[in-house]
Amino acid sequence: GWTLNSAGYLLGPHGIDGHRTLSDKHGLA
């Protein structure tokens, strides 16, 4: 999910936070 990661950084803190939350819930650290 590097694409999502890059998108998150581009979107800003909210994007990063959302991505991290999804990773946490799915356990895809």
Curated annotation (Swiss-Prot):
The gene is gal. Belongs to the galanin family. GO terms for biological process: neuropeptide signaling pathway. Its main location: secreted. Contracts smooth muscle of the gastrointestinal and genitourinary tract, regulates growth hormone release, modulates insulin release, and may be involved in the control of adrenal secretion. It comes from Oncorhynchus mykiss. The modification Alanine amide is found at A29. PROSITE patterns: GALANIN. Keywords: Amidation, Hormone, Neuropeptide, Secreted. It is found in: Secreted. This is Galanin. One of its GO terms (cellular component) is extracellular space. GO terms for molecular function: galanin receptor binding; neuropeptide hormone activity.
